[in-house]
Amino acid sequence: MQILPAVLEKDGKSFTRQIKNLSHYFQTFQVDVSDGKFTKNKTAQIDEITESIYKEKLNIKHLTFDFHLMVYNYREEIEKIKKLSKLVNVGYILIHKATNPSLDYLTSSRNFSSGLVLDIKDKVDDLPKKYNLDLVPIIQIMTVNIGYQGTPFMAKMLEKIDDLKELGYKNKIYLDGGINNQTIPLILNRKYRPDGLGIGSFLTRNENIKQTVSYLKSL
């Protein structure tokens, strides 16, 4: 399983501080972006992140950022990400199913690879009604109510991995939300495991970072 630090910060300065702290251990990150409307919590915006990287003259082109867009206007955010892509490698763009992105938009060529995010209320069985899942490169399953780090893990959401596999989905499956040393055993005990784990406060708010990284990389 790939481990991705999920970076959810309130401003550009806090964001770059986290990247500098964690880039000693990781090359790929998941950047949480919330507009304060799709969720109540507003994070550092992409323009702020870009400005902070420029201001601090960070040389991080070797790092890859996936973007988890907790926003209504994902098209506008993707235009901002295009500008940021001059400074970092951009991996996956993760768009919430609730914002109703079309399959054509997800699969069209825009230099980035886009996938779906399933919220707590989203049902896997509804996906084939709108999407050819063979063409969706990644699906991220939320295991918490979105917007804040440190909210309770919902183990029942792990059943969605089974549901996707039973539908014949063969592309990447990520989990995000409430993942730590208490909940990881629940994930590892499943018949099907995810391809990636977005790790938030367990990494970003942890005082024993070296020990935590060692544990995560041993999975």
Identify the role of each PLM range.
Residues 15-20, 47-55, 78-82, 103-106, ...:
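Generic structural signal for well-ordered alpha-helices
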